Amino acid sequence: MAFMRKAAVYLGLVEDDEERYEDYDDYDDAEPHRREPREAVERDLGSRRTAVVRRMDARESSPADPAELRRVSEPAPTERPTPPLRVTTLHPRTYNEARAIGEHFREGIPVIMNLTEMDDADAKRLVDFAAGLTFGLRGSIERITSKVFLLSPRNVEVTAEDKRRMAEGGFFNQS
């Protein structure tokens, strides 16, 4: 409707509402004086209420006797027994088995991918999938041997000793 009204005003069919208002020359554009909040509070509370304020010295803020001091100790960290680290070793034969790798990794389980039984083209695709998976879930991927990779979730740290055992074949005999 505003468009129609503006068109009618332009064509001179109706009177413009803005022309009805007169300009006032004595209008002051300056901002009105604001009183300070403290002044307003003092004026409002002036006769009704008075408060007594006393400044506290540094001597008064600390206890006079060291025996009055109470020692607060931090609670000792409780060590939760960590469950034994479960590592899944998978020997995929086709790229279609990538889903199983992703599901185990998403659950927070380190995955060893043994790609020795795959052809090179599918192995490359699976390594690309694993790299994207570890990047997306903030994990890490490491090459153990030429066609064997370790995928570690972000909250799992595999020690150098474990990696050495994997390279020697200690984990590959589990499946």
UniProtKB/Swiss-Prot annotation:
Homodimer. Interacts with FtsZ. Pfam families: SepF. Belongs to the SepF family. The keyword Cell cycle applies. InterPro entries: Cell_div_SepF, Cell_div_SepF/SepF-rel, SepF-like_sf. GO terms for cellular component: cytoplasm. It comes from the Bacteria. The gene is sepF. Residues 20-29 have a biased composition (Acidic residues). This is Cell division protein SepF. Cell division protein that is part of the divisome complex and is recruited early to the Z-ring. Probably stimulates Z-ring formation, perhaps through the cross-linking of FtsZ protofilaments. Its function overlaps with FtsA. It comes from Acidothermus cellulolyticus (strain ATCC 43068 / DSM 8971 / 11B). Residues 20-88 are annotated as: Disordered.
